[in-house]
């Protein structure tokens, strides 16, 4: 049995868009191969071999995306579920010592974008806030010690 792949709705849509783009690109690469194959000497036909390699990479990524979409467990949460932090939640944390705040959105491991504040729900911060309520104090174990935060806000 294949495990479900946790994913947000936006992550699912992003994969669908990438799949559509790759299918169009595959057609273009096949045409490049056909044109390059018109040069009868296949042993030293660099454009043909480059296009063939590119097609293999595209085919591999298409299969990977199709697998992810087939087994995706898309998390859909609405504003009525904002009492607890879940997949897709945006959570604002406040450090009780200095009052500094930081904001993170919990996503699947395949959707992480640290520079945009998108972190994995299975990361140390993600695990610490998951299924917690607004106002709760959390502790996060890091190599340098323990960090404490208060959940200031939860949104979707």
From Swiss-Prot:
GO terms for molecular function: DNA binding; RNA polymerase binding. The keyword Cell membrane does not apply. Residues 12-72 form a coiled coil. Keywords: Coiled coil, DNA-binding, Transcription, Transcription regulation. Gene3D superfamilies: Transcription elongation factor, GreA/GreB, C-terminal domain, Transcription elongation factor, GreA/GreB, N-terminal domain. The keyword Coiled coil applies. It holds the Pfam family GreA_GreB_N. GO terms for biological process: DNA-templated transcription elongation; regulation of DNA-templated transcription elongation. NCBIfam families: greA, PRK00226.1-4. Necessary for efficient RNA polymerase transcription elongation past template-encoded arresting sites. The arresting sites in DNA have the property of trapping a certain fraction of elongating RNA polymerases that pass through, resulting in locked ternary complexes. Cleavage of the nascent transcript by cleavage factors such as GreA or GreB allows the resumption of elongation from the new 3'terminus. GreA releases sequences of 2 to 3 nucleotides. Belongs to the GreA/GreB family. This is Transcription elongation factor GreA. It comes from Dehalococcoides mccartyi (strain ATCC BAA-2266 / KCTC 15142 / 195).
